[in-house]
Amino acid sequence: MEPITFTARKHPFPNEVSVDFGLQLVGSLPVHSLTTMPMLPWVVAEVRRLSGQSSKKEPGTKPVRLCVSPSGLRCEPEPGKSQQWDPLICSSIFECKPQRVHKLIHNSHDPSYFACLIKNDAANQQSICYVFKADDQTKVPEIISSIRQAGKIARQEELRCPSEFDDTFAKKFEVLFCGRVAVAHRKAPPALIDECIEGFSHVSGGFSSDQSRSALQPPGDGERGPRPMRKSFSQPGLRSLAFRKEFQDAGLRSSSFFSSFEESDIENHLISGHNIVQPTDIEENRTMLFTIGQSEVYLISPDTKKIALQKNFKEISFCSQGIRHVDHFGFICRESSGGGGFHFVCYVFQCTNEALVDEIMMTLKQAFTVAAVQQTAKAPAQLCEGCPLQGLHKLCERIEGMNSSKTKLELQKHLTTLTNQEQATIFEEVQKLRPRNEQRENELIISFLRCLYEEKQKVHIHIGEIKQTSQIAAENIGSELPSSATRFRLDMLKNKAKRSLTESLESILSRGNKARGLQEHSASLDLDSSVSSMFSNTSKEPSGYEKEALPISESCFRLLGSSDDLSSDSESQLTEEPALLSPKQGFRRRANTLSHVPVECQEPPQLVRGSPGVSQRKLVRYHSVSTETPHERKDFESKADHISDASRTPVKTRRHSWRQQIFLRVATPQKACESPKRYEDYSELGELPPRSPLEPVCEDGPFGPVPEEKKRTSHELRELWQKAILQQILLLRMEKENQKLQASENDLLNKRLKLDYEEITPCLKEVTTVWEKILSTPGRSKIKFDMEKMHSAVGQGVPRHHRGEIWKFLAEQYHLKHPFPCKQQPKDTPYKELLKQLTSQQHAILIDLGRTFPTHPYYSAQLGAGQLSLYNILKAYSLLDQEVGYCQGLSFVAGILLLHMGEEEAFNMLKFLMFDMGLRKQYRPDMIILQIQMYQLSRLLHDYHRDLYNHLEEHEIGPSLYAAPWFLTVFASQFPLGFVARVFDMIFLQGSEVIFKVALSLLGSHKPLILQHENLETIVDFIKSTLPNLGLVQMEKTISQVFETDISKQLQAYEVEYHVLQEELIDSSPLSDNQRMDKLEKTNSSLRKQNLDLLEQLQVANGRIQSLEATVEKLLTSESKLKQATLALELERSALLQTVEQLRRQTAELGSQESDPTLPKPSGD
């Protein structure tokens, strides 16, 4: 019986599915890359015209097959029904990525035609317009939709999955973050880095010596000590240099300390910006991974597993290396400040040596150069107002939708703008082709215009490029103009505009209530728009550091009726109200100034014209800024109320005056044209600060009349404060609880992600219960468990979620049974302290991070949490064990440990495996122990599997060709994780000889398959590729064989045999004096190492002897004590026995007297 199958309809392109469409290719035409959508119908018409002119031998349309998929858009010729498609004969017409389809157009007059404009990667190359015809016009929308969907999916894939070039290009370096410096210019002298370092050391010393003084409070004149240094830089613009470094105190989380290089007046202009990188305390980890990408640099903290700083190349303006401190470097970048501007900050870092700094500087230079070239190549071509194609674009927009006659008139008008020669040429070319009708004539004219404008576009220089130098000069001249003269002219023009506008509004007001209603709903009119346009060529917006140098009185503006103005009276308000106008105010956005009608009583013009240095206050959205007095305010309120009451009655629509028509024509369209940022919804009004009663805002808000707020008593204010404080405390508690829940959830997800592998020996519930009972034993770290019981438990299986805890338990049992370490232990340096240092092995570690378990989800993310934790472990061990440092293969060992436990616990277990279990010997730089291990494996094969050994020797295959990764990575680089985890179970139980037993069992169980291969390549490929893909049954069989095998004595014998053979070969071989001397020196060094090892073993043996002797003495002492106790007990026993006998005799005598009354009773004497 066949199984039941069904197919479900899926979304297009779920898994790179290609959709084919049978079409007719009408033709193609190369056009300029700046071709716009209005031009495209005329291009299609030209393609169809050229296709209709083709001869009978070469038909105009070709049957093609259009293949659409997210990976590519391909057009191939259709061979026909009788022929089979052959890729050697039928090559594709074009092939491109779907995101390169720039425009798609569907012909509305003839729905069976559509066209696509394919844009080339290079900006200077031409685009190609392909025109297709479908046999069924109803399929055209489906084809267009499929192409758009394919392009959308392809673009999403590009954003979701970065290219491989990004990962390979990014270079990572470990650096130590020293601090950040606020500077006043984007460039700096070469000695900046050295001065920063000296300033950091001075700041650190000053802060530690005087911790009682607040870090943010500058010292007084009497307390001011000597400055760290004072230097006048010759580079212009570098006026001040301020150090900022953050520390941590017992009472303060972080604080900032400023120390200036310049005179005392510079302290008023210290740059205060947001500290993006929170520099940690000296007691915290300040090491970072400095990563250089294609277009940005970023700092990753391995401690927090987060990006601490990310800067684009555009924001970096200066990079330098220290002159005296050659192991330091830094860069200056732009950062945004709280006021909307920006300032410049220099970040300083330290490396391990000068060579690493040189490499970083070279990498930065290359990255900047490549990014600049790519940015220039990828810059999109744009049209300026003077572009020839811009004129053609506007012409096509004008004639769009016109009939042939009107289009012909527009084209004739446009031709008059050309030169006589160009007009004559176009006229002659059109007459040569003899168009049948006006439409064909129009198409020909557009075609020749397009060719003419495309030729002009090739030699055209954009307006922005021409005026670039002149604009810079004009900006410089404009910035040097006196601000007072500019403000005086601006005030005069504003007053004139205000008077003319007021007169217009008064006439409108007198016309009736209908005009009043229209004015209330119209958009605002910016009084300064014409003025700002007139002064746009002579004024310039100041740059970031120029803004910061402005005094506070010139850069800050206060609104009328704000909280600062409540304390002032009406008279002082009139005199103090105008504020200084900044150059930036001329370019501000339009503000709502017509939400209500101005007062009839105009303020005297001399108030504004009297002082040329003052002007109107800055306008704000939904605020009406004026300079009226409180008395004028009352008059206005009464009149406004009267007008609002009168406006509720219906009024007949009357004809507007010429001033009203001008006003409505100017003001009304602004409401529809303004950007959405300008007109925000009324929900934002609730977040605005409360306005003063003096402020002339509209009385009727969007939600009705605004009630006047009452002044609250102190008791009510106190209750509000208490309520707010309690709510804040509750919110903080809830936030902490949410963070705890989120952290626990992340830990569970992280643990589940780590243990994402298949177990080889699934644990039964009984076995899991046994392990849980063992792990829950109180004081288990001091209790010795039975070895047979532990062997049995490990043999039955280890639960995956308890594996890390079980490994720690087995390590504790090893330390209990071996109280004296068999080898010299490393320094007891805390893990956190090791992470604060820089390692010289960073390059090798960073390279191997991507190679370690690349398919596992925990390590697959580039510089994710898994890779950063693994980097920390390997870095800490390289600093702890200077002799070994880092060796390839250690990343796999540490990676397996990290999957089953935390970061610091994995580091401790790595130390246990390396020093206590003896794995450290095989990672030494000389690799002598690894050679001995290869010899031992060969001898095991010779003794246990002779035929396999002979087969491998026949093809000259030594163990180093296939077994070296097994020993260095403990099978983790080639075998499944479940199998490797079981190998680690046995290593923690039995030691490093487990690796030999597993290798011997694997080769022995696959011996028949290996013997079938008859050459070196196939044998090695089978051992490396096929053999690791074991089945579950074969893996369990291998593990059970390892538990039953004991080869410890053979391994010791083979090691001694290796050393004997090495000495014999050295003595027997005829060598020259130099060679003999070299070998003798090598032998001497190896013998010294052996002597050191023997001395270590001797020390261990002496320690064991001393411990045994001490144990014997303790036992003898306890034995003598026990003997004395036994003797005392025996004496006590004899005394008790005598007492019992006496009691028995007395009892017998008493019994006999009671039975015979004639016997005299014993006297009471």
UniProtKB/Swiss-Prot annotation:
SMART domains to which the protein is assigned, alphabetical: PTB, TBC
Domain PID: 243-401
SUPFAM superfamilies the record matches: PH domain-like, Ypt/Rab-GAP domain of gyp1p
Chain ranges of the Rab-GAP TBC domain: 797-991
Purpose: May act as a GTPase-activating protein for Rab family protein(s). May play a role in the cell cycle and differentiation of various tissues. Involved in the trafficking and translocation of GLUT4-containing vesicles and insulin-stimulated glucose uptake into cells.
Residues with PTM Phosphoserine: 146, 232, 234, 500, 504, 522, 524, 562-563, 567-568, 582, 611, 624, 692, 938
Annotated GO CC locations: nucleus
Cellular compartment(s): Nucleus
Residue ranges of the region described as Disordered: 207-234, 624-651, 1146-1165
Modification Phosphotyrosine, positions: Y949
Compositional bias annotation for Basic and acidic residues: 629-645
Signal peptide: none
Protein name: TBC1 domain family member 1
Keyword Phosphoprotein in annotation: yes
Subunit (UniProt): Interacts with APPL2 (via BAR domain); interaction is dependent of TBC1D1 phosphorylation at Ser-232; interaction diminishes the phosphorylation of TBC1D1 at Thr-593, resulting in inhibition of SLC2A4/GLUT4 translocation and glucose uptake.
Record GO terms (molecular function): GTPase activator activity
Keywords: GTPase activation, Nucleus, Phosphoprotein
PROSITE patterns for this protein: PID, TBC_RABGAP
Superkingdom of origin organism: Eukaryota
Description of post-translational modifications: Insulin-stimulated phosphorylation by AKT family kinases stimulates SLC2A4/GLUT4 translocation.
Sequence positions bearing Phosphothreonine: T502, T593
UniProt organism field: Bos taurus (Bovine)
